């Protein structure tokens, strides 16, 4: 796959993307899933990320890869029993970009899997130019099977790499969802703990807490500075606490600000999605800060400026 993409330099520029950004566990998945109901939006399916090449040209080829991917996911859920409650993944559901970055050996996925402080520092300081060159190639390859109106993309770590994104996608737009870090940080610590338990016999939960707040505060601080260069029609802010009260209205307002068209079919799909699962806005994944040697004072100390700016 890598060689095939590397040697092909005749790709067209991909369709302009819109990126959902924000701290992990801040409502990005709910927002992403609702936006994906718009037929104008195209996101990679999980099976496409895991088994892209050679391109699946027939329905039979796609079904085989879906089956293979679902089999792999069943194994993953056996290894990480709480994965289903933390983050729903299926072969045919839209998926975020983090697995693409793993191919470039620059992904926060690896810091979830193991206690690797040197690697965390590497992620904070290394260039991500090659990550997004590869990222762009990936979507160019997907477009060989058809170009969408717009790419809908998501990855929590994108918040720390806005200049690199804009270098490859100069017309990119962003939807930044904000949630109180005292809630989102605890949730990501719990996710990290459950992933790491699959790879380590012993884990240090206090170390997980320290690593998580340091790494994500670094990314967020960088992102908040970098986004100052964006115009008002390039980025929209959403408060999670308000969004969950009326997701559809917030999405309609977001479309207006980004000059996207909202049709009645998309409105109906979003409403149906929300009505079909009345528990969608209720967390099944339980966690507390003190499990990870943290308290609200620690979070407020690390994220002080951000929390003041967004009234948390």
What do these predicted ranges mean?
Residues 21-23, 152-156, 240:
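Short His-Asn-centered micro-motif
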């Amino acid at each position: 796959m890598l060689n095939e993409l590397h040697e092909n330099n005749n790709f067209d520029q991909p369709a302009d993307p819109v990126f959902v950004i924000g701290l992990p566990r801040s409502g990005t998945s709910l927002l992403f899933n609702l936006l994906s109901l718009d037929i104008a939006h195209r996101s990679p399916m999980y099976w496409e990320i895991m088994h892209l090449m050679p391109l699946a040209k027939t329905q039979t080829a796609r079904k085989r890869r879906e089956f293979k991917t679902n089999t792999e996911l069943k194994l993953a859920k056996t290894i990480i029993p709480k994965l289903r409650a933390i983050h729903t993944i299926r072969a045919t559901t839209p998926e975020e970009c983090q697995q693409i970055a793993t191919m470039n050996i620059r992904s926060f996925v690896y810091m979830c899997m193991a206690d690797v402080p040197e690697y965390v520092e590497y992620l904070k300081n290394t260039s991500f130019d090659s990550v997004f060159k590869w990222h762009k190639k990936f979507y160019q390859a997907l477009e060989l099977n058809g170009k969408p109106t717009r790419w809908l993309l998501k990855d929590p770590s994108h918040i720390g790499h806005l200049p690199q994104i804009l270098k490859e996608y100069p017309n990119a737009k962003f939807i930044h969802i904000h949630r109180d870090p005292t809630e989102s940080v605890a949730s990501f610590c719990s996710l990290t703990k459950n992933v790491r338990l699959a790879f380590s016999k012993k884990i240090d939960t206090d170390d997980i807490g320290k690593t998580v707040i340091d790494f994500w505060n670094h990314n967020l601080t960088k992102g908040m500075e970098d986004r100052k260069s964006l115009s008002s029609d390039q980025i929209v802010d959403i408060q999670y606490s308000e969004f969950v009260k009326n997701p559809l209205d917030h999405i309609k307002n977001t479309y207006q600000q980004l000059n996207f068209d909202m049709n009645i079919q998309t409105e109906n799909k979003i409403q149906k999605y929300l009505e079909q699962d009345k528990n969608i806005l209720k967390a099944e994944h339980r966690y507390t800060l003190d499990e990870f040697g943290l308290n609200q004072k620690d979070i407020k100390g690390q994220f002080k400026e951000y929390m003041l700016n967004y009234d948390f």
